[in-house]
């Protein structure tokens, strides 16, 4: 049966296209939109936080620089070898540190002196060297280093937004980090996936502040949600298809039955009338199918009978045209022999009568190949009387081939054509070779006559396709058309010839119309 899409299949597709798929699409669009908005908001937040942190650090740096500038002269009057001056220096530096919002530590180092507020002996290598300054105390130069451990704003950003801060130098060496996943002193290598970050320049030393956020957890949550949605979608699709199939089966059972009957009617296997299970309007279609099938069957039988009659008429007409053509040539021979050899003329008349009895037999259009060969031998014998035994006939055939059944008068035109167009002043040798192969009889008729030029050969080949009742050339054209009527396109007739080298005709006759070699 030809493949088609039943109504229930279309119902499944409609259910998916109109309900399940749009809902799933809306959810996907919503989820993608949510993540797009989330990424956009996070980018804006990171941008805002990096600007705020930069501003805060710049403000602290400016206050420290202002303090150093204002107290530079007073520091020069102090002598750090004096205990009271050391205490005054510590007091001023602590005042500077405590005025800043960041957690800062200082180290003042010089000749035989080291002052710091790092009383807990924290490792300053884990802190950011915020700034360095040279201070002069009583003609002695000291180095002031200020370290940043943290700032309230960075801590707030880390706590509230889970955004972490890094400070790196121009070579991407990490100088500060409030995330344990990074080690100070190592190279900063930005992650390509699962991280969002933004950086800004901090100072003239090309230090950069980086605020970043790890969104792996959010992505994993989104993937988990997508998996859950996919599972739910699959379950919905399965449930929807099963429901639609059950509903469609109940509602379209009669439709499928009618489609099946149409298929059977197309292949002429409908059978007797069978009503539908459900009494509905579809019963009218069912009745119409059977009525149309019966009408078509009657019409087909009528056409087949007409075609058979037409083939019989055409075959008889072709055979009728063969007889005058042959009789004319033979009667000329008899007329010639009556004067020279009445006894031989009597023999020719007897042979001619046997041939006419064979050709006018109307009870069947088929004969054994052996009968056709006997007819050809009598035909050549008559022609030899006319042409002084110039024709030599050789038949090569197996016994099995001789007992095959073929159409009557299917070989004689080949011999007639060889004698008529191949004979010259010298003798003419004609060889008939008969072979069986793959349900076909292969006939090869070869002569050593004058042959044909290439233009004449092309003309003869083209004339084979002319209408049998229109052409004036009877022989091969009649034979070819008769074969087409009796055997259809399975029969083949090929002509090969060269000038002064003879002619070869290859003729294939199907022995079984049901299994032929095309």
UniProtKB/Swiss-Prot annotation:
Pfam families named in the record? HATPase_c, His_kinase
EC number(s): the record gives 2.7.13.3
Under the GO molecular function aspect, what terms does this record hold? ATP binding; phosphorelay sensor kinase activity
- What name appears for this protein in its UniProt entry? Sensor protein kinase HptS
Instruction: Name the catalysed reactions.
Output: ATP + protein L-histidine = ADP + protein N-phospho-L-histidine
Primary subcellular site in the record, as a coarse category: membrane
**Which cysteines link up through disulfide bonds?**
none
Membrane topology listed for this record: Multi-pass membrane protein
- Where is it localised? Cell membrane
Keywords, in A-Z order: ATP-binding, Cell membrane, Kinase, Membrane, Nucleotide-binding, Phosphoprotein, Transferase, Transmembrane, Transmembrane helix, Two-component regulatory system
The protein's role, per its UniProt record:
Member of the two-component regulatory system HptS/HptR that regulates genes involved in hexose phosphate transport system in response to changes in extracellular phosphate sources. May act as a sensor protein kinase which is autophosphorylated at a histidine residue and transfers its phosphate group to the conserved aspartic acid residue in the regulatory domain of HptS. In turn, HptS antagonizes CcpA-dependent transcription of a subset of CcpA-regulated genes involved in antibiotic susceptibility.
Which parts of the sequence belong to the Histidine kinase domain? Answer: 297-513
Q: What does the PTM comment of the record read? A: Autophosphorylated.
**Cellular component, GO, one term:** plasma membrane
Q: What class of enzyme is it?
A: transferase
Membrane-crossing residue ranges in chain numbering: 20-40, 222-242
- SUPFAM superfamilies from the entry? ATPase domain of HSP90 chaperone/DNA topoisomerase II/histidine kinase
* Chain positions with Phosphohistidine modification: 325
